């Protein structure tokens, strides 16, 4: 029987020859990730079910990124809980406050390879599907069961493949592609589906750009966002991981597969407008909207390629006096390479604030929140009310290039319009 890549991975993990969409399976977990914000509840739930030892400390990864450094006594206590837990359980894959955002650090450190089942107590765990894994977010109670047993049940999802074709125009990036797709599909248009990204345009993208697509699959309700592994994928994991991998491909006649054709050849930069991610418009329709803050970072667009795109625009230019620009590299490795390439110097000279690698204002709780009536333009993935501070603020989402150009202009701007 023909299957999709997601079905093949879940079949492998559950010890079956085949699975079908809608079937309930009990799958072995290859990687279990938690962080400083959701980890303590996972630990509490683990204790509550009477367990003393995790099933396999080598398959558990703990990363501090949400409240880094601790911004309150409660956050400091959460950090202490997790530090004690990793020491008690012998968890070696522990990344304290210095490393960066979990969805950048996890693949960077070689913890994800094709063919794996990856779970994390964060909704954007779907990011790691860009490496050909079945990756999805779970709750802290589910993670407690994973800690205890190394297994978790799944309902096998149907697959919606986005066949993306066409050459991207100047100033158009992966972020514009995924925003356009979400705008067309809707915030709940792919609920509990495996969103598969394919086609010639995706094949031309770097692994970092593919991560942008997978990262935002959850914003249309997707269970995961997955890209079939190719040589780019394997080159990425070869440099970072010594783990074995398995390459699975979708059979074109798989019964649960539906396909949506996406032509991006005429696409222009996109902006998600308040207060929903699927409220997407071309940048030209919102150009001139005044902004108070620009946030360049997050697990969506805080990678080196994003910093390069922004720095190319900011070089020999200044951030508008009316704008606060925050630059938050997604990881220490990204920060270090940006330093080596002179990108940090460009940001500082332009008048941006460069912060330590962390989630920043994305979760609305740390580093650079916005106040009532203020407008933020962000390269992150969500713009719900209160997402970056006050529920009376407005948050727009864009690519790094649009964010940088807008920081210079003081209002939402097409990068091509800067003189």
From Swiss-Prot:
It comes from Methanothermobacter thermautotrophicus (strain ATCC 29096 / DSM 1053 / JCM 10044 / NBRC 100330 / Delta H). Catalyzes the isomerization between 2-isopropylmalate and 3-isopropylmalate, via the formation of 2-isopropylmaleate. GO terms for biological process: L-leucine biosynthetic process. This is Probable 3-isopropylmalate dehydratase large subunit. The lineage of its organism: Archaea, Methanobacteriati, Methanobacteriota, Methanomada group, Methanobacteria. GO terms for molecular function: 3-isopropylmalate dehydratase activity; 4 iron, 4 sulfur cluster binding; metal ion binding. It is an enzyme of class 4 (lyase). Belongs to the aconitase/IPM isomerase family. LeuC type 2 subfamily. It catalyses: (2R,3S)-3-isopropylmalate = (2S)-2-isopropylmalate. Binds 1 [4Fe-4S] cluster per subunit.
